[in-house]
Amino acid sequence: MPAMAMWSESDYRLRRADRIESSPRRTAGNVLAFAVRSTQAGGVFTMNAPGHRKTGNGGKPFMDVLIRQTMAENPHELRALGWAFSYFFALLCSYYIIRPMRDEMGIAGGVEHLQWMFSGTFLAMLAVVPFFGWITRRWVTRQFLPRMYYFFIANILIFYVLFQSNLTHAYVARAFFIWVSVFNLFIISIFWSFMADTFSNEQAKRLYGVIAAGGTAGALAGPLLTATLVVHMGPVNLLPVSAALLAWTMVCIHRLIAWKHATVAVNPAAGAALGIAATDRTAENAMGGSIFAGVGLVLRSSYLAGICLLILLFSSLATFLYFQQAQIVRDSFDDPATRTAVFAAMDFSVNAITLLIQVFLTGRIIRRIGMGWTLASIPLLLMTGFLALGVAPVLAVIVVVQVLRRAGNYAVMRPAREMLYVVVSREEKYKAKNFIDTVVYRGGDAVSAWVYAGLQGAGLAASRIALLAVPLAGIWALISFKLGRRQEQMARAAASPPHDPKRRNPS
């Protein structure tokens, strides 16, 4: 029987939804979607030689098995995955193009002032939170997200004009350093809020690893673009390139919104099968509330307060480890070029390991061991790492601990951490999450930096400080485990029928 004849009515309607969402252009997602449909219908990918059918797992086509086990369950979902991947790729590529300029501006602003610039970043975060709260009060998601990116694009172009006018005052350099630090956390927080608002809990377990891989690929492509173009264009002229990539993210946002709406509007049953609930009318309205609603939401929810503790411990221990790394590498090598080479090798190892885990293992790990153990795995790893540093604070140990910690965080813990927000309300996804990811995160950075400096000033060696961090990592692991279990309870409660006795609000 021809493959076309084997399509169900729901497949046909979803195909019509695809056309509504993407017409008139055809993207790579269309080709992938058609290939998967053909495979599901018993066909083969035309990439294979004629007559050759690559199979496995009970005779199923190999690519079908690979896609189903690592990514989307159906071609329509694969399209959304492609747009989300592209969105995160462009976002982090844009950031990593300007990140080297930020580091240079940090030096230009005075190395002796770096701790004050960290504090300035925290104060800037305090100003951003009410600004974001005001925006979400006035506009719906499809309106305020593009406006936020227009704002950041305008900021980039303003700095471009300032640098082109040879305005190189130290205050401009410091302002750029602080702005990029705010920009980084803010855009990533908003991205994951939007993902939590787009995909269901079940979809997030399968797709977040691959979506995160898009960010990793962007983080690799950004420095590569910078290294390739900076010789010919100069660092300042890379700012419009960063702005152009940021503009592309708005296309991805509109496509993802259209994908969700088209799926539910054309066939609500098919939308439910994909894990998309019927359209919530409140999603079409602005969220309203106070501009400081994020703070209030956190204070009223023990679940969100637990996430705050998780982020505080995460950022504090990461700062401790960063200071340990700086001390050990400084004492191991006198040559700045050698130190740079060590850091570059570590970054490459982290990104390579992260990308492989995100694409092939993240979803399986979360589904296999559950949210609790997934979230606790990296704190337990770091607890072991600090214990090792307490015994042997040497280069080999810090390199292994940092590479494994960073790769595990990006590949496993970050996607799982973002899943904590899938089960909360829309207002909490945007307002509370933004407060936690910016003010709480940078607050933890700032406080822990001064605490570490105080411990050093008190005469404690790096090994002693590492041992002090061990129980903190244990507390972090316990909180992470409990939050993961709580998230699973809330997800089950949300999936239960309205009158089911199991349906309750654990928060």
Task: Annotate each language-model stretch with its function.
Residues 34-35, 44-85, 111, 138-143, ...:
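Intracellular loop-helix junctions on the cytosolic face of multi-pass helical membrane proteins
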Residues 375-409:
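C-terminal transmembrane helical hairpin of 12-TM major facilitator-type secondary transporters
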Residues 138-151, 367-378:
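Cytoplasmic membrane-interface "Motif A"-like loop-to-helix N-cap segments
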Residues 122, 149-156, 243-247, 315, ...:
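Residue-level recognition of pore/gate-forming positions within transmembrane alpha-helices
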Residues 137-138, 197, 231-232, 367, ...:
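Membrane-helix boundary and inter-helical linker elements of multi-pass secondary transporters
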Residues 151-168, 381-393:
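C-terminal ends and interior cores of transmembrane alpha-helices
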Residues 228-244, 454-473:
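A membrane-interface helix-boundary motif in multi-pass transporters
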Residues 80-132, 172-231, 274, 286-297, ...:
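Substrate-agnostic recognition of the 12-TM MFS/MFS-like secondary transporter fold
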